[in-house]
Each structure stands twice: as C-alpha cells, then as structure tokens.
Amino acid sequence: MTQLDQLKQFTTVVADTGDFQAMRAYAPHDATTNPSLILKAVQKAEYRPLLEQAVRDARSDSVEDIIDAVLVAFGCEILSIIPGRVSTEVDARLSFDTEATVAKAKHLIALYEARGVARERVLIKIASTWEGIRAADQLRAEGIRCNMTLLFSLAQAVACAEAGVQLISPFVGRIYDWYKKDAGANWDPIAQGGPNDPGVQSVLRIYNYYKKFDYPTEVMGASFRNISQIVELAGCDLLTISPDLLAQLQQSDAPVERKLSPDNANAANIVRLPADEKSFRWHMNADAMATEKLAEGIRLFAADAIKLEALIEPLRAAA
C-alpha cells in the first residue's frame, strides 16, 4: 500500500493546487487554492480558454469582478473532479477590514450558487487576523463556512475555535522556515526534524487543544516542505498537500502510522487559554514568528493578487 493510501486511512487528503488537471491522479477529497496558486495556474496555456471565458462571463469592466469570476471558475472545475469542498480565498488586501471581508465572501458564495454549487461545498479562505476571525464569526451565522488561513499560533487557533469557524489551516512549512532561518548555523536538521519539527509541533499543540476541549473546528495542516512533516501529522483531521508531495507519497510504500489522535489529546495536560481581543493581540505580539509570518503571508498574497490583476487587465480591455 502506498504512503498516500495509508495516510488516507487516518486523514482526509486535500490537494493544494489551482492546477486541477494535476490533482486527478491522487483522488483527493477536498482542494485548496490561494492567489499564488491561481496565478501560477492561469499562466499555463491549457487554462487560457478558462481564463478568457471567465472574463466574458463576468459581464463587467471591473477587474475585481473579473478576478472573482476567475476564482469561481477554477473552483467549479475543481468541484467537478473532487467529491468534497474547495477553498476560495478572499483578497488578502481585505485582511484588516471585517465588513469588506464579509461582503466579498457573500459575493463569492453568490457566484458559486449562481452556477449551481451549494454553499456547503465551498470554504471561504480568510487570513487569521482578529478582523478576519470576526468576519468568519459573522459569516458562520449566515451559513457560510470559512477556512482560516495564514495561521501560525495557538492564539490564532483558539480565537478561531471560539468563533466557531469551520476549519483552520496552520502553516507547517512556513513555521519551519522561520525557525530554520532564525537558528542560522545552529540549525540541526536531525534534532529539529521528524516529531521535533517546529511546524509539526505547532499543529500537534493546536490539534490536541481542539480535541481536549471538544471544539468541532477542523484542523488542516498546510504548507509542507517535505514528506516527513506530512507523515508526522498522520491522524490530523485534514492535510492539504501539493501535487509534488502527493506524487512522492504515491511512489513510496514506507509505513505510515497514526501520530495524532483524540485519545492522546484527551490524555494531555493542557491549560485553557483566554480568547478575547486583548489576549489575542498580546500573545501575537509576544510571538515573533507568528507576527512576522502572518504579515509576510498577507504581503505575498496581496502581491500575487496585484500580479493577477495585471494579467487580467489586457483580457478585460480586449473583451
């Protein structure tokens, strides 16, 4: 049995790509996209017709409306391949604007529903800022499910759980990157790999906290750098994995054992944390890694959104 098939016994496998042709071979249950992945996909020749059709379907001169149409077009194509849910991301430039995030999420869901897609099959991705979490809380009350992304700390995870969000995406690889860079020449890949990988440990803490205190919010590990990180999180609710790493899992038959479980979480000695705004901001301020990676992630996604706009502009002008 391949590592991928073994992993699927413990964890829902999600494809992390906008390239829906690439995910067919791995039979994922769900899929996630983000501005960077969509930007990468739309530059491939095989997706040019989809891009041009989305521009026509938008029936708008607004680049913002056209990009929303492109995101939903890719999401619909992905949903024709997978049995589960697709995650579509709100513009990162709205990360500190609760009202605008809510409005954008409602608009994206309306576009999906206009194409016959039930809102239950769509997760709206929102950056895990305080303002983003408040938006997710409002959206939950209106039946719109959210995937809280750019999550790097337990403080963010606790705030999301208290808001009753559907799912969170802690970023394993980016946490690993920060600690590796911070350690410099003192980084020991053996001592700080496997179960001691700082990204793996972060997800383990969050998973155990959620299960210990019976939060229904799903935990989906994301942003992996290697197979070891994935295998160490076998048993996590979901793991979203790039096509390259899915291919490696499919080509290996090395054993995969369950590492995360509700039983282990319930046996752990865990202190409950406050989830109010001042506690959230204090804990984020005290966590240099989480603060820096959240800010960096928002900047990177915003930059790719701007690049996507530049790519769309000539198509809009020609339509």
From Swiss-Prot:
It holds the Pfam family TAL_FSA. Keywords: Cytoplasm, Pentose shunt, Schiff base, Transferase. It catalyses: D-sedoheptulose 7-phosphate + D-glyceraldehyde 3-phosphate = D-erythrose 4-phosphate + beta-D-fructose 6-phosphate. Its EC number is 2.2.1.2. GO terms for molecular function: transaldolase activity. The active site is at K125 (schiff-base intermediate with substrate). SUPFAM superfamilies: Aldolase. GO terms for cellular component: cytoplasm. Belongs to the transaldolase family. Type 1 subfamily. This is Transaldolase. It comes from Ralstonia pickettii (strain 12J). The lineage of its organism: Bacteria, Pseudomonadati, Pseudomonadota, Betaproteobacteria, Burkholderiales.
